[in-house]
């Protein structure tokens, strides 16, 4: 079995909707444009089940923690317990400072890169050995810009306009992760280690 639970990290509230820290939530908006996701409240967040994911026979759950970023682990831990999901069946989609906008990176385990949402998940699960899909948001334009303020700043209009294409380009990877068994994932890790999906110059 591949990925069973996909978590999209972000902050609830209208003031955070288009901020860089909410890149995963913005991506989710454009991942499944042709279906209405059956969201319901649960596991300290919004959770939805998709049967026959992207035409496969697999079932996958989607989770948007509503605990705010720094407490994401409380929601993820509750969902993993409810679904009996282990770390190897968990994919966390999150913003990544070290990648430029338009670049995504698939990773399993490893360091947390100072990301408070990932840190919270590790603290609750007791392991960092879960999958991550890192969505590039780029670094601040100047070293004088505070990182905390930067990740809570809004995307530029050109970046916002690119999210539909970013969502379409990412959907294929998510489908492969859901239907691919653990033994075959090394190929995906290699292909998606650092992949540019779009350029704002296009």
UniProtKB/Swiss-Prot annotation:
Taxonomy, superkingdom: Bacteria
Compartments reported by the entry: Cytoplasm
Residues annotated as signal peptide: none
Pfam family, one: Pept_tRNA_hydro
GO function term, MF aspect, one: peptidyl-tRNA hydrolase activity
InterPro entries: Pept_tRNA_hydro (IPR001328), Pept_tRNA_hydro_CS (IPR018171), Pept_tRNA_hydro_sf (IPR036416)
Positions marked as site (Stabilizes the basic form of H active site to accept a proton): 95
Site-annotated residues for Discriminates between blocked and unblocked aminoacyl-tRNA: 11
Active site: residue positions: 21
Catalytic activity: an N-acyl-L-alpha-aminoacyl-tRNA + H2O = an N-acyl-L-amino acid + a tRNA + H(+)
Swiss-Prot/TrEMBL GO biological process terms: protein quality control for misfolded or incompletely synthesized proteins; rescue of stalled ribosome
Enzyme Commission numbers on file: 3.1.1.29
Family assignment from sequence similarity: Belongs to the PTH family.
Subunit and interaction comment: Monomer.
Protein name per UniProt: Peptidyl-tRNA hydrolase
Organism annotation: Treponema pallidum (strain Nichols)
């Amino acid at each position: 079995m591949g990925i069973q639970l996909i978590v999209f990290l972000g902050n609830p509230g209208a003031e955070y909707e288009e901020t860089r820290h909410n890149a995963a939530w913005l991506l989710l908006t454009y991942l499944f444009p042709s279906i209405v996701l059956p969201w319901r409240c649960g596991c300290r967040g919004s959770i939805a089940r998709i049967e026959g994911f992207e035409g496969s026979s697999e079932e996958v759950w989607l989770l948007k923690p509503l605990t705010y970023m720094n407490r994401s682990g409380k929601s993820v831990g509750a969902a993993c317990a409810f679904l009996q999901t282990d770390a190897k069946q968990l994919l966390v989609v999150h913003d990544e400072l070290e990648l430029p906008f338009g670049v995504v990176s698939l990773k399993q385990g490893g360091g947390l890169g100072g990301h408070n949402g990932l840190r919270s998940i590790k603290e609750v699960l007791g392991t960092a050995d879960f999958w991550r899909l890192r969505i590039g948001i780029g670094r601040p334009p100047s070293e004088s810009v505070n990182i905390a303020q930067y990740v809570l700043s809004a995307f530029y209009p050109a970046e916002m306009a690119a999210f539909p294409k970013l969502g379409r380009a990412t959907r294929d990877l998510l489908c492969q992760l859901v239907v691919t068994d653990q033994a075959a994932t090394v190929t995906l890790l290699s292909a998606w280690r650092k992949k540019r999906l779009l350029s704002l110059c296009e």
